């Protein structure tokens, strides 16, 4: 099997590049640049203003009109040639990497990975949060490891919503207007040489979808788009908005993803060895493959069993109520045209979507996926246990735990990365478990001065970025020049800084810190040992309680007592997240156990030597080692949620008062917190391998992909 799959595309737009710089187009139209800082530095050098505004190489190429000065700049030309040579080497030498070296030709085709969202970089905003960022990191790591891999998703021209917080703390919703020609997207080309389009039959009409390609290193990501002239005006918006509120529109999206995604691969001549469903949104791809086999003369049972053998499923939600469900009558109505045309028994298909609660009026996407895949996993060891207990009545095979990881080259900050590289570390090539011991050894060798200075550099970057964001935010609220001027003094790097940043679902308890306002105010405003806290996060437009949590935090941030010490940054995205995980001292996470399936933001923080303070849930249940962070509460939650909330808040305050604040402000003769630095080393050393996507993907290959490909 070739080490990567090549999908033919239409040519990149003509940016009138001189022949000596034509390689810039190859760089711009491959998301490789999103995790290789040297490429980003190259494009920033071409036009810093455009780069800072858009963070997109395509935007830089579109804006550039005169290349003469760059052609005559020998330093730039050397930089360009070096970057291009490294990129070409990366793309051409997959057989040097883990999959080819360890597993050779064990797969007869690629892994086809389906997900509703992908977080690759903020300039391509087709993600909402952790699921999409995980999918993006999964693709990047598959590329780095030269795993034969193709990903499938949807192109959301309006993206996920943009968040503003008004002067009263209410969340406001706006949307993008993404234009493909301004993004690193090219149309896939079918074997006839025409731009690829697929179709799905729905009641009374055919819906068409264009197929775009976002190249992610060696991995092609196919994105389906219904906003095409062939469609009725009522169908063009199907793929416009990620997690659109209307249930019927959402079901249309998931049919396009599952059914259309399979058809896109077929049209492009891709024959996957394994099919991976990342969450249940794409479960109709299983029905579509069964339909293909029924049309070839197989019985439905035989067809489903054949599909099942080569399909694997990752479940992300611990409780049944959090899984995707649709009205069974609506599913019947929308799938009837395809089912009737193929002779499939729609009642059998609907029965396989019966959830754990036995409610036949609902079609449960997770239940359907579990029944029709041969291997399934939760996204942490604890989540695997919880999922097994929840879904045992549904399936006859265990749900294993494969703990999520994150992609270190994407998430480790420049200063911390340099510290590791100065000691021989290489985040771009961590391909064996030997790296686990090497990272421990390297972190133990980092001098106090180097580690502390790197951390303060990343805190300074956060301060600069947050000041700009907050000033823009408060100016929109009509704050005075005096108040806006005071923002110059916020987020002092010499003050203990805590962050809580994630989706504002109520089970995550974002406002737990304010359970006892008087006590936390005393802690935060202590004149000798103050604390500053930065919040960020979105609540889904339909989640009114989550939006209420945002308003509560906002009101505390603008209160007389806490103003200037508590902040909430609006429009949480990958860029905000990078600055926070790289630039704070403590990463706070306090969900209700066991409702946090994984929680990868804490892993990103730990890799930057930021210390976690968290409930023992998700990844932290296995990642906590007593000396690499702090655990809030224990492992036996009280069924009385109010009592548990209060108990967790009290333990959080105790840890701050008795351990965290004293340790941070305990300085040696050089002004450095020695005990804190020791814990920082352990935080990074215990996460850089154990919670990397490299480790994660090795487990997917050996525990899921290869067994499924072999029919085991």
Language model segments and positions:
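Catalytic cores of carbohydrate-active enzymes across secretory and cytosolic contexts
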Residues: 1-712
């Amino acid at each position: 099997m070739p080490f990567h799959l090549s999908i033919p595309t239409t040519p990149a737009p003509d940016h009138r590049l001189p022949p000596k710089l034509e390689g810039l187009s190859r760089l711009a139209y491959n998301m490789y640049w999103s995790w290789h800082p040297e490429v980003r530095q190259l494009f920033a050098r071409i036009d810093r203003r455009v780069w800072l505004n858009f963070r997109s190489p395509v935007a830089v190429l579109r804006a550039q009109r005169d290349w003469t000065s760059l052609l005559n700049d020998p330093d730039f030309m050397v930089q360009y040639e070096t970057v291009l040579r490294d990129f070409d080497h990366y793309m051409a030498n997959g057989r040097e990497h883990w999959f080819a070296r360890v597993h050779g030709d064990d797969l007869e085709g690629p892994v086809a990975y389906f997900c509703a969202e992908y977080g690759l970089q903020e300039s391509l905003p087709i993600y909402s949060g952790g699921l999409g960022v995980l999918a993006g990191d999964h693709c990047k790591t598959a590329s780095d490891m030269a795993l034969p891999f193709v990903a499938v998703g949807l192109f959301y021209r309006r993206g996920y919503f943009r968040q503003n917080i008004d002067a009263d703390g209410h969340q406001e919703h706006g949307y993008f207007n993404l234009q493909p020609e301004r993004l690193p997207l090219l149309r896939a080309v079918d074997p006839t040489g025409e731009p690829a389009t697929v179709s799905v039959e729905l009641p009374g009409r055919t819906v068409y979808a264009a197929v775009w390609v976002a190249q992610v290193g060696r991995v092609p990501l196919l994105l389906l788009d219904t906003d095409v002239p062939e469609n009725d005006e009522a169908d063009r918006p199907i793929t416009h908005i990620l997690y659109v509120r209307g249930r019927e529109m959402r079901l249309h999206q998931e049919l396009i993803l599952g059914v259309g995604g399979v058809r896109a691969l077929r049209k492009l001549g891709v024959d996957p060895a394994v099919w991976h469903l990342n969450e249940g949104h794409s479960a109709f791809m299983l029905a579509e493959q069964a339909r293909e086999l029924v049309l070839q003369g197989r019985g439905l049972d035989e067809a489903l069993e054949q599909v099942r053998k080569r399909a694997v499923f990752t479940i992300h939600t611990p409780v049944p109520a959090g899984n995707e469900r649709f009205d069974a009558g609506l599913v019947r109505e929308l799938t009837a045209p395809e089912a009737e045309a193929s002779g499939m028994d729609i009642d059998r298909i609907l029965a396989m979507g019966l959830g754990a609660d036995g409610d036949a009026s609902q079609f449960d996407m997770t239940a359907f996926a579990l029944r029709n895949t041969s291997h399934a996993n939760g996204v942490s060891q604890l989540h695997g246990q919880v999922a097994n207990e929840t879904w045992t009545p549904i399936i006859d095979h265990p749900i294993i735990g494969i703990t999520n990881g994150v992609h270190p080259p994407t998430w480790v900050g420049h200063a911390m990365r340099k510290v590791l590289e100065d000691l021989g570390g290489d985040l771009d090539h961590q391909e064996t478990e030997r790296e686990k011991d090497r990272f421990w050894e390297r972190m133990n060798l980092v001098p106090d001065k180097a580690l502390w200075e790197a951390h303060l550099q990343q805190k300074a970057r956060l301060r600069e970025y947050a000041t700009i964001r907050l000033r823009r935010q408060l100016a929109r609220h009509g704050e005075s020049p005096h108040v806006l001027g005071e923002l110059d003094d916020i987020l002092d790097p010499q003050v203990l800084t805590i962050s809580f940043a994630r989706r504002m679902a109520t089970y995550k308890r974002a406002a737990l810190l304010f359970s006892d306002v008087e006590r936390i105010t005393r802690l935060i405003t202590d004149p000798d040992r103050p604390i500053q806290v930065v919040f960020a996060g979105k609540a889904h437009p339909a989640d009114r309680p989550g939006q209420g949590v945002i308003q509560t935090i906002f009101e505390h941030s603008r209160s007389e007592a806490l103003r200037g010490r508590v902040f909430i940054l609006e429009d949480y995205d990958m860029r905000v997240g990078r600055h926070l995980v790289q630039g704070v001292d403590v990463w706070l996470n306090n969900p209700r156990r066991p409702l946090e399936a994984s929680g990868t933001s804490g892993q990103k923080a730990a890799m930057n030597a930021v210390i976690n303070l968290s409930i023992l849930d998700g990844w932290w249940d296995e990642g906590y080692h007593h000396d690499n962070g702090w655990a809030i509460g224990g492992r036996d939650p009280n069924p009385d949620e109010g009592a548990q909330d209060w108990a967790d808040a009290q333990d959080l305050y105790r840890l701050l008062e008795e351990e965290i604040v004293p340790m941070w402000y305990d300085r040696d003769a050089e002004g450095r917190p020695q005990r804190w630095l020791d814990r920082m080393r352990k935080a990074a050393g215990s996460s850089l391998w154990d919670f990397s996507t490299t480790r994660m993907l090795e487990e997917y290959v050996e525990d899921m992909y290869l067994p499924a490909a072999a029919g085991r």
